[in-house]
Design a protein with these regions (language model features):
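Single conserved hydrophobic/aromatic residue that forms the stacking wall/gate
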Residues: 1-15, 19
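Domain-scale recognition of functional cores that engage charged ligands
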Residues: 17-278
Length: 278
């Protein structure tokens, strides 16, 4: 969130459920504290988000689905930092929260272990990275996924959301092409504008970034969660020199963007209210 409305990145593979829970709880708190604000400004409700998400998931049922469809949320487990949010969202949607060892391929279909035996699963809402999804097809050391799951998926017998491979749009270099992609496929200009982005793989743009590195935010194209980036105006001389070497050695691994004035929200600290960036 920032002013004016622009996007700084796309998360299309497994965006954190932490933000979804915070969104719902924040709205509930705000409704209790400032009900007139929402009534006066006709703010759209979001409390039905979990059910809307479930509705969307059920709309992706495979052709093999029967009248009584089964949707589950696949979590890495209780040691994952977002496990509480996974449990919260599964509970709100009224679906089963499962780990990899709760699922099994039976007779060419994905099944969930229950007290009544195996039950066929039609849709898996995955909350783990693709590489851990199936040790037979991806990372063989993964103990979080389901052996053979991807084979069932390729045969069209189960839906995985978001689909494996959609994480390509998380790539920050891909982000810089999004306006052109939107126009190519829709014939329309995007409603939400991108932040200006320099692709360091292009020599002229790399030269600009190197000349202005102290003013820009440098991001690793495959990085996430604040890793692999440098904020020029607050960086030390050592950090700037380090990133300059990285840009020269592997320019294709980086993009650059201007620093932004992010939106803030008031929070309560031990010294009273203070603004914090969203």
């Amino acid at each position: 969130i920032r002013r004016p409305p622009r996007s700084t990145l796309d998360r299309s593979s497994a965006a954190s459920d932490v933000y979804k829970r915070q969104m719902l709880e924040n709205r509930e708190t705000m409704l209790q504290m400032f009900p007139e604000l929402f009534t006066k400004n006709r703010v759209q409700p979001i409390q039905n988000y979990p059910q809307e998400l479930l509705y969307s998931l059920k709309n992706t049922l495979p052709d093999t689905a029967e009248n009584k469809s089964n949707v589950c949320l696949l979590t890495p487990g209780p040691y994952n930092s977002a496990y509480f949010e996974h449990a919260f969202l599964a509970d709100q949607m009224g679906i089963e929260l499962v780990q990899g060892n709760d699922l099994k391929v039976v007779d060419g279909f994905l099944a969930m272990r229950t007290t009544q035996g195996h039950q066929k699963v039609d849709v898996v809402y995955k909350r783990l990275d693709d590489e851990f999804l199936d040790p037979l097809n991806f990372n063989e050391k993964s103990g979080l996924g389901v052996p053979g799951l991807f084979d069932v998926y390729r045969k069209g017998r189960v839906t995985i959301a978001n689909a494996p491979g959609t994480g390509i749009a998380d790539d920050k270099a891909m982000y810089s092409f999004m306006p052109e992609i939107v126009e190519f496929y829709s014939g329309e200009s995007p409603l939400l504008q991108n932040v200006p982005t320099w692709r360091c793989a292009i020599k002229d743009q790399l030269n600009y970034v190197l000349d202005n590195i102290h003013k820009l935010v440098i991001k690793q194209v495959h990085g996430s969660g604040g890793y692999g980036m440098m904020i020029g105006p607050t960086a030390t001389k050592k950090d700037i020199a380090n990133f300059r070497r990285k840009l020269i050695a592997t320019p294709q691994d980086y993009i650059a963007q201007p620093t932004l004035s992010l939106s803030t929200v008031p929070i309560f600290t031990n010294k009273g209210f203070a603004p914090r960036h969203v």
